Amino acid sequence: MRLLSFCLLGATLGAAEAPVFTPLLDAQLSQWEKWLGVPHRSYEVPGYVRGATPKEDPVLGLNRDPLDVFTVKVIDGEPVLNITGQVFGGLTTLKSFENFHLRTQHRWGTRKWEPRLTAVRDNGILFHCIGEHGAGGKNWMRSQECQVQEGDIGDWWPIAGAMVDAAVKDEDGKVVRYVPGAPLRAMRSRIWHGTDYAEKPSGEWNTVEVYAFAGDAVFRLNGRTVNVIRHSRYREKGSEQEISLKAGK
């Protein structure tokens, strides 16, 4: 993950209710738990014992953050989440949500870490998170992802067996893009954001929103809809059974 600053507000939604936003950040991150994966071998981690080979290196795990990957700063009187990106992982709400409107604002920092020194900065909003931490690449829970990456905010990624239906079209056999009005297709791999896209330059604040209701979700960037997913669900590894995924952390 490569996000520097992140402001979070959440609202629960009802069929005929106006949203009431609830701040999700405080200085102690009291509404969240941390999970961190395997630190890159290019730097030392206090108190961390590596395995005999890179594949045997253990995860840092739950609420163990010796490098302060996740901290809160106060900017203009408001708590702002600072993520260094030095270790892949996630910050997960303690509470589960089903129907909600999540509104975030973020801007990028300048520093990068191995293994992404030459890659674009990358993060994501993962929602409907269920199951065990680390199910996806030792870093994330099973979930749906709204990608927050430089140049690709609003792409959809499935984590640990998640899948959806979406209105998409193929581009050049390489890109599957969200296209409003296109036929729905069952998807288990990346869906690129739509062409109505307006990301702000690095260093400026972008507003990213996720609306989730009854298993569907809408991703918006700076007031524009960039992706829509339908019928959130998942499959266990090796199974063809599809299980509804409408709520989670």
Where are these regions (language model features)?
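Sec-dependent N-terminal signal peptides
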Residues: 2-14
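N-terminal export leaders
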Residues: 1-2, 223
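Carbohydrate-interacting regions of secretory-pathway proteins
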Residues: 16-249
